[in-house]
From Swiss-Prot:
Reactions listed under catalytic activity: ATP + H2O = ADP + phosphate + H(+)
Coiled-coil regions listed in the entry: none
Residues bound to Zn(2+) 1: 44, 47, 66, 76
Keywords annotated in UniProt: ATP-binding, Cytoplasm, Helicase, Hydrolase, Metal-binding, Nonsense-mediated mRNA decay, Nucleotide-binding, Zinc, Zinc-finger
This protein's name: ATP-dependent helicase upf1
Region (C3H): 44-76
Highest taxon in the source lineage: Eukaryota
UniProt similarity note: Belongs to the DNA2/NAM7 helicase family.
EC number: 3.6.4.12, 3.6.4.13
């Protein structure tokens, strides 16, 4: 409550008071007034609760917040810290613990998301210690502390009540009510004006609404009018994010490579906490800010990112002159934001809208969603479509290849382990063979994918067939080794023997690390000519979707285009290769696995996270599905097949072929290597405050990995998958600190996100679900596509670690836990004495609002008329498995994206279980 008077008026009233006759009395009352005034302003910035025992001060912005749990499930102080990315707090001076700054007793860190407590020797005293490294037994051993009692000071996204008392019910009734949307809006206002308050929420909001992706468009101009603003919004967001990530006081060590270029090695604390993302080939700027020498800065490309072996980042500098290798401290690191990918998307949209020759008429209308008669090609195909040096095609693969070669637009759906890459390579082989017969109109086949890894994998397979393949990589990646480096354009130029002068200049530059201005100009001309010859002679050109906008490629026209992993590419990404003259297009992917990554939540809400592959399916373009899987033990494929693919997957491997009999592991059923291992550890917020970890599951991971290693399983055969970066980082550290085997063995075990494992496989997979709160949602774990990817990476065995009681409250996981229970895979106990876990399961009830919105969307959506094998009518869906849930989730997501505005995003995500995704990693649908 405020005093209701302005400060000047308060002082005037004191001075004019007849009762204040002594100077001491005046000073005393003046001080009391100032204290009262200050006290009245120290209230929760969200709801105005001001009980000193219930509020904390954010030391970053100096605002106060209470410990009451809001509608979002988190207390107001935690909601603020997470949204604002702040981490330090202090108690109120009038609280029972005084104005204490919460920090680690041992190292002084003030990151509250790292802090926990243990009882000290005195029973009435507790000690605050950070989770790592200070709560490790080796550090606290000498202090006689029982570290097994360490608990985080934040539980269920609320400070523990003995530390910060939650407001009473009476205080909460008097508090100003505030919704999650209003809190989000207030945080946005504070970024622009730190003095904004609740009254500012009533002011008119700037219209920053974005158009939503549509199913159909009148013409290409309308298409551009919708997608162009979304690309720009995503670019602006990415730019702000990258440019705000300057890191000071970086310590550097130096190394010089054979090419005489210097590499700077350093740690990035923000990277460790999950605040920023980094990829090979990213450009960064390194600046020296010390006093030992003159100011210096240089840019370079990232050649190494943190992994299980080392947390260091490697930055290879572009130039090697005047590098301060004698200095190691006082450096800063900045991201160098590049607009290249966004510019190329915008260019593709512009060309699509203004140049009618960029696509065939048929493809133009199909991409816009127009109803036009089907079109068929009449290629001369052999009876056996298998190709040289690749496995013989099975029936579904052969049918898919034959069908797509006779159509100008085709979709191939490749569920996990079904030989999608072999099928794609076979399609490309026949497309290239047909093109080579047309000598006058010969053009290479353009093969693209959204990621470099996917491009490399497909390029390697195509090369095996005997075709001439050229892999075009970005200039920033030319020095990065890959399995297909010998196919890269720049490597082929180095070995281009038809121009001795070119070879002489390349050798001279390699030896001297530079050329004269005249020789440099001459070399550029010779390289361009050689590139032209190599590209013209190629049967197949491989690059990323964004790479197709490279000037070396974009000046050519490509009649045939194949895009692999098309469901992971945004629609504008796909348009970059398509507008290079496409007349025949093949999109390959699986829309039941992970979709495109979109950083900006508002852009994701506008459906830019929907791939072109998905939109075409909704429009009625049925994909050709590959149905024989060659990866998983049959017991591992059963649930994914029934849940995500209507039971259509067939096993191309037998049980005996997928039993690792030499591995001594306590499977509850030796011939069925699938296990849901019940773990009931507490979930905790990670150091970033935006991700989660579970120490119990991390400990179990280490025990399982150690058991495998003792059974002579190679560490490279084991993969640990988790949806949360906080858990990934903690597992890596935990195995290093607590594993009983050699540390190098644990370093070689890959621990990564679900996203990082898509398209890959391991012999054994451990899935750590992390989420275990009775009061919160289960977040990313509830995404059907993530579960599908996680369960389908292993060949010989899967172990799922999680809390079945919590997970089974959600429809998708209810069916998986039920499946495991009925099959006898649900277990509990120690690893050397596992037993079946008896659990009573009750089918979860969907919220009525979910059902109501779903019914509305069913009446509106064209999905039910799509005619796709992947989208059956709702009435015919199986009851036992969660296919219905998967389709409902997707339909509901589409409906909410189209019908909601940006402020509805939190409620939308919470209804589908991802209530904290607004704080976590980028949106990936």
């Amino acid at each position: 409550m405020s005093l209701g008077l302005q400060p000047n008026n308060d002082i005037s009233s004191l001075v004019s008071s007849k009762n204040m006759t002594s100077e001491n009395g005046l000073e005393h009352q003046f001080e009391e007034l100032l204290v009262e005034k200050q006290y009245s302003e120290e209230h929760c910035a969200y709801c105005h609760i001001k009980n000193p025992n219930s509020i904390l001060k954010c030391l970053h912005c100096n605002k106060w917040f209470c410990n009451v749990r809001g509608k979002s499930g988190a207390s107001h102080i935690i909601s603020h810290l997470v949204r604002a990315r702040h981490k330090q707090v202090a108690l109120h001076s009038h609280s029972s613990l005084s104005d204490t700054v919460l920090e680690c007793y041992n190292c002084g860190t003030r990151n509250v998301f790292l802090l926990g407590f243990i009882p000290a020797k005195a029973k009435t005293v507790v000690v605050l210690l950070c989770r790592q490294p200070c709560a490790r037994a080796s550090i606290a051993k000498d202090m006689n502390w029982d570290l097994t009692q360490w608990q985080p000071i934040i539980s269920d996204r609320q400070f523990l009540p003995w530390l910060i008392t939650p407001p009473s019910e009476e205080e909460q009734k008097l508090a100003i009510p505030i919704t999650s949307q209003q809190m989000v809006r207030l945080e946005e206002l504070w970024r622009k004006d730190p003095n904004a308050n609740l009254e500012d929420l009533d002011k008119p909001i700037e219209d920053d609404s974005l158009p939503s992706v549509e199913l159909r468009y009148k013409d290409a101009h309308a298409y551009q009018a919708v997608l162009s603003p979304l690309i720009q919004a995503e670019a602006d967001y990415d730019k702000r994010l990258k440019e705000s990530q300057t890191q000071k006081d970086v310590v550097v060590r130096w190394d010089q490579a054979i090419n005489k270029r210097y590499t700077a090695w350093f740690l990035l604390p923000k990277l460790e906490s999950g605040e920023i993302r980094l990829a090979i080939g990213d450009e960064m700027k390194l600046t020296y800010e010390g006093e030992l020498r003159a100011p210096w800065s240089s840019t370079g490309y990232v050649i190494k990112i943190p992994n299980n072996v080392s947390d260091e980042v490697g930055l290879e500098l572009k130039r090697s002159d005047k590098v301060p290798i004698e200095c190691t401290h006082n450096f800063s690191v900045d991201y160098v934001w590049k607009s290249t990918s966004f510019d190329r998307m915008q260019t593709a949209l512009r060309l699509f809208a203004t140049d009618g020759s960029r696509l065939s008429s048929f493809l133009y209308h199909k991409l816009l969603g127009h109803d036009i008669p089907p079109s068929f090609l009449k290629p001369k195909l052999p009876s056996d479509l298998s190709v040289p040096n690749l496995p013989k095609l099975n029936a579904s693969q052969s049918e898919a290849v034959r069908a797509v070669l006779s159509k100008p637009l085709s979709l191939i759906q490749g569920p996990p382990g079904t030989g999608k890459t072999v099928t794609s390579a076979s399609v490309v082989y026949h497309l290239a063979t047909m093109q080579s017969r047309k000598r006058k109109s010969h053009s290479p086949v353009l093969v693209c994918a959204p990621s470099n890894v996917a491009v490399d994998q497909l390029a390697e397979k195509i090369h095996r067939t005997g075709l001439r393949v050229v892999r075009v990589a970005a200039k920033s990646r030319e020095d990065i080794e890959s399995s297909v480096s010998f196919l890269s354009l720049h490597e082929q130029i180095k070995n281009y023997k038809f121009n001795p002068e070119l070879q002489r200049l390349l050798k001279l530059r390699s030896e001297n690390n530079e050329l004269s201005i005249q020789d440099e100009k001459k070399l550029r001309i010779l390289v361009a000519a050689a590139e032209k010859e190599l590209l013209r002679a190629a049967h197949v050109i491989c690059c990323t979707c964004v790479g197709a906008g490279d000037r070396r490629i974009s000046k050519y026209k490509f009649r045939s285009v194949l895009i692999d992993e098309a469901t992971q590419a945004s629609e504008p990404e796909c348009m970059i290769p398509l507008v290079l003259g496409a007349k025949q297009v093949v999109l390959v992917g699986d829309h039941q696995q992970l979709g495109p990554v979109v950083m900006n939540k508002k852009v994701a809400l506008a459906s830019l996270s929907q791939s072109l592959f998905e939109r075409l399916i909704i429009l009625g373009n049925s994909p050709f599905r590959l149905v024989v899987q060659y990866r998983m033990h049959p017991c591992l494929s059963e649930f994914p097949s029934n849940t995500f693919y209507e039971g259509t997957l067939q096993n191309g491997v037998t049980t005996s072929e997928r039993i690792a009999r030499h591995v001594d592991f306590p499977w509850i059923q030796p011939d069925s290597p699938l296990m849901f291992y019940a773990n009931f550890g507490q979930e905790e917020l990670s150091a970033s405050g935006t991700s989660f970890l579970n120490r119990t599951e991390a400990s179990t991971c280490e025990k399982i990995v150690t058991t495998f290693l003792r059974s002579n399983v190679l560490p490279e055969q084991i993969g640990i998958v988790t949806p949360y970066d906080g858990q990934r980082s903690y597992i890596v550290q935990y195995m290093q600190n607590n594993g009983s085997m050699q540390k190098d063995l644990y370093k070689a075990v890959e621990v990564a996100s679900v996203d990082a494992f898509q398209g890959r496989e391991k012999d054994f997979i451990i899935l750590s679900c992390v989420r275990s709160s009775e009061h919160q949602g289960i977040g990313f774990v509830n995404d059907p596509r993530r579960l599908n990817v996680a369960l389908t990476r292993a060949k010989y065995g899967v172990i799922v670690l999680g809390n079945p009681k919590v997970l089974a409250k959600h429809a998708l996981w209810y069916h998986f836990v039920l499946h495991c229970k009925e099959k006898g895979y649900l277990v509990e106990g120690t690893l050397n004495s596992l037993q079946k876990f008896s659990l009573t399961l009750t089918p979860p009830q969907k919220p009525q609002k979910f059902k109501r919105d779903l019914n509305v969307q069913r009446s509106l959506s064209p999905i039910q008329n799509a005619g796709s094998a992947m989208l059956p009518s709702f009435s015919n869906l199986p009851n036992l498995y969660s296919s219905s849930y998967l389709e409902e989730w997707n339909v509901f997501a589409q409906y909410k994206r189209r019908e909601s505005n940006a402020t509805d995003f939190e409620d939308f995500r919470s209804q589908v279980g991802d209530d904290e995704s607004k704080f976590d990693e980028p949106t990936r649908f």
